[in-house]
Amino acid sequence: MLVIRSLTSALLTHNQSSSIDSRPSPWMTPLAYALGSWVVLPSYFRIHVTGQENVPRDGAVILAPTHRSRWDALVVPYAAGRFATGRDIRFMVTADEVKGLQGWLIRHLGGFPVNPRQPAIASLRHGLEILQNREMLVIFPEGGIFRDKQVHPLKPGLARLALQAEASQPDLTVQVVPVYLDYSQAFPTWGCKVNVRIGKPLQVADYTQGKPKSEAQRLTADLTTALKRLAGTETEVMETVNGAGESMPVCLQHGQMHG
């Protein structure tokens, strides 16, 4: 999974649309959810979900999970998708993550491939379209898989996209929902325990009064704090985000970093 790393002025205007189609299939998507939720995940993991009531049942929503495993693309729909909340989920994935059985499930659960190094404008527009259509989009704000339990510095792309969407329609009311994923094993195997903790949503409209750059930084900082609380981490330090000299809080836990 990846985070959108940059947004440009070429992003969606009201009369533009992307060429990407990630709409759920009327018959394949229910099958994928059934296989994932009733067969694959329950037979492989022991999953415990808390905070499902915090996922809005309608409106434009960005789910912002930590990223610990390729399995996340199946665990998040299990915890917050069709069978849990009545809502379908869309999310961006790397090309490698749409291969094999896992990839088949991911594609039919709403995943669409994006180049993580040079995401096409069409991919960014599609993410914006999803929010403008008041649907639910998953963005992994850490920007990559980290196999420890720390909350790593968040990339700024999620906040920028959220603010871009909020500015595009005055009544859109975009919400960002923090999600902490915790696996009992760094490289999950059969019987691994998975805890999914879903926090209260952040209202993007609360971050529209100042300059876009500073408000994006503030939203990113508040999302980091929310993820830290879900993780139960204790030590907060300032880290540089994406090498750009922008400081954001990141929470550290004791223990060795694996990823």
Predicted regions and their residues:
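Non-catalytic C-terminal accessory region of glycerolipid acyltransferases
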Residues: 4-16, 20-24, 28, 121-259
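A conditional alpha-helix N-cap/helix-loop micro-motif detector
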Residues: 45, 117-121
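Structural motif corresponding to alpha-helix initiation and N-cap regions
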Residues: 49, 99, 121-124
